[in-house]
Amino acid sequence: MTTTGHPIVVRRAEPRDADAIQVIFSGPKVIAGTLQLPYPSVEAWRKRLADFPAADHWLVATIDGEVVGNLGLHDGGKSPRRRHVGQLGMSVRDDRQGCGVGSALMRAALDLADGWINYQRLELWVFTDNLAAIALYRKFGFAIEGTCRAHAFRDGRYADTYAMARLHPSFTMAAEPQ
């Protein structure tokens, strides 16, 4: 994938990416579209990237070596009954939104989830007014499963989110008991 002739490279995030990730999460569009708080600390991101659990997978998208987006793919919970579930969250730097960065991150995350981790279900939450993100997730097979009313406090008021999920393409449910 390229943007203006420059390839988008997705790789594993490293602690050295903390400065760039802090810049991403300082952008007004990113703050408005995620559950992160404004004014993130570089040191907090450095620690988070250095200490993330083995079950978490952090990816970054780069253009010409510059980090312009990130995605976290996490276990769906500690319950053994949800080992088949992954949860994801992503962000793209404000000035790189709409340039294919989100699609590159999603392709890499789905390859990891489907081909290597064997997640059968991926979940995410997205603000109902984040139309570009909703369109991106739908493009990659996610469907809205419900509305979470007053799910998050954002910019002085409560905001709704959609719960979205995607089942692995080969997933089949057991037959319903009769």
PLM regions with names:
Residues 8-23:
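A short beta-loop-alpha structural element at the N-terminal edge
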Residues 12-16, 34-95, 106-108, 112, ...:
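Acetyl-CoA-dependent GNAT
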